[in-house]
């Protein structure tokens, strides 16, 4: 796993913060979506916020503290939170593109979510495997 640079981590925190503001102000802008974003969007916010907060916390912590084990744990937690967010979004699915005559987009988004959940699940398994190897390799010795 390549070590992330401080600039990349800072950009990640900023991007996640911007997304958090956009998602959490949905009651202000939802009316301009012509019915595409449904009232149920509020029901996915807890999972989206959790994912964004886990990503931001991990990135902020890695700006100052980057031992290999910690980075692996932070990435695995971020992946798990992202997969949870995709699952909740898929189950609730707070979008309806049929309101603008593009009902097929709903199916495409669902397929993309399924692919994302599968990819995230596989990625999480790989990250947990790497974490296990790192835990054994970099185990602390008591002196």
What residues fall within each predicted segment?
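Membrane-interface segments at loop-to-transmembrane junctions
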Residues: 1-9, 36-44, 67-80, 104-107, ...
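C-terminal TM-helix exit segments that contain a strictly Trp-centered aromatic cap at the helix terminus
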Residues: 22-26, 83-95
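Cytosolic juxtamembrane helix at the C-terminal end of the final transmembrane segment
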Residues: 124-143
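Interfacial non-cytosolic loop connecting adjacent transmembrane helices
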Residues: 33-41, 89-111, 125
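Loop-to-transmembrane helix junctions at the membrane interface
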Residues: 55-88
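N-terminal signal-anchor transmembrane alpha-helix
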Residues: 1-51
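Alpha-helical transmembrane segments of polytopic membrane proteins
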Residues: 41-54, 107-117
